[in-house]
A protein has these predicted regions:
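Alpha-helix boundary/interfacial micro-motifs
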Residues: 88, 134-136, 166-167
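N-terminal entrance/gating region of PLP-dependent enzymes' catalytic architecture
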Residues: 1-110
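Glycine- and acidic
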Residues: 77-85, 107-114, 140-142, 167-173
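Conserved beta-loop-alpha segment that forms the PLP phosphate-binding cup at the N-terminus of a helix
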Residues: 94, 98-99, 110-139, 155-159
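Arginine residue identity/basic-tract feature
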Residues: 30, 45-47, 54, 131, ...
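PLP-dependent aminotransferase-class I/II
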Residues: 117-120, 139-176
Length: 176
């Protein structure tokens, strides 16, 4: 079937969710092909298809065949790119791509930066850098963030994670 002919979202019925909720912790393992089949038929088919041409909503980053292959390779090799000693070539590629991106936007030749898993982690990383550049352990409790009422929810969550409490987050109303 063509993707255009498929629904954008396939919703699960309550009885299908109830079936999952009734599953008990198994006492022994099951054959992999049985588990994969169950996942394909009873879990993965009920979803919003971000690759669908009529999908216009939350943007989780739809998978392409190339990104899928990249995920498989990354999982298979379990590379931790947290430092040049653990994965020197992956770390080198990351640094070179950061240089390419920096050059495209007119930044310095030796930028700092890291790749992260998505927008929420990017927000936490940026908020942490801003906090650490501005506050010390002594005055952390004074840190206050100003965000608009249109700011993505991951920013307020990130602020809480890095120690800026709700009472120190100021939401500014927007009018246009």
């Amino acid at each position: 079937h063509e993707i255009h002919d498929q629904p954008v979202v396939v919703e699960a019925k309550e009885h299908q969710e109830d079936k999952i909720k009734q599953i008990k912790i198994p006492e022994k393992g099951r054959p992999v092909n049985e588990v994969v089949s169950e996942m394909m038929n009873e879990v993965y088919r009920y979803r919003g298809d971000a690759n669908h041409p009529r999908f216009f909503s939350f943007v989780p980053g739809p998978a392409s065949s190339v990104s899928w292959l990249g995920d498989i390779m990354t999982s298979a090799y379990n590379i931790h790119a947290g430092g040049s000693k653990l994965a020197p070539m992956v770390n080198c590629i990351e640094q070179e791509v950061l240089k390419w991106l920096a050059k495209q936007v007119g930044f310095t030749e030796n930028p700092g930066g890291v790749f992260v898993s998505g927008g929420s982690m990017a927000n936490i990383t940026a908020l942490t850098a801003a906090r650490d550049n501005t506050l010390t352990d002594i005055n952390l409790h004074l840190g206050t963030a100003y965000i608009s009422d249109q700011t993505h929810s991951s920013v307020a969550k990130g602020l809480r994670i890095i120690g800026i409490t709700d009472s120190r987050i100021r939401r500014i109303p927007t009018n246009s």
